[in-house]
UniProtKB/Swiss-Prot annotation:
This is Small hydrophobic protein. Viroporin that forms a homopentameric ion channel displaying low ion selectivity. May play a role in virus morphogenesis and pathogenicity at various stages of the viral life cycle. Accumulates at the membrane of the Golgi apparatus in infected cells and may facilitate virus release by modifying the secretory pathway. May enhance host membrane permeability and disrupt cellular ion homeostasis, which can be sensed as damage-associated molecular patterns/danger signals, triggering NLRP3 inflammasome activation and inflammatory immune response. Changing residue 26 to T: In strain: ATCC 51908. Glycans are attached at residue 63. The chain crosses the membrane at residues 20-40. Four species of SH have been detected in infected cell cytoplasm: a 7.5 kDa non-glycosylated form (SH0), a 13-15 kDa form that contains one or two N-linked carbohydrate side chains of the high-mannose type (SHg), a 21-30 kDa polylactosaminoglycan-modified form of the protein (SHp), and the isoform generated by alternative translational initiation. Of these different forms, SH0 is by far the most abundant protein detected during virus infection.
Amino acid sequence: MNNTSTMIEFTGKFWTYFTLVFMMLIIGFFFVITSLVAAILNKLCDLNDHHTNSLDIRTGLRNDTQSITRAHV
């Protein structure tokens, strides 16, 4: 009977390609993580600007109301 086992030889060429593929996967992983963090921070900044603007509008209206009340007194 013939022995039909498969042998993988770990030559210098194999390690070169393995390292290249591994580095590409790591760079892609960091790109995805960086994109997600940037999107989350962008969304948080948009929400913060909205709250800040609405607070400024309320404060401005409150100050206008107080100045109108003082003018009538």
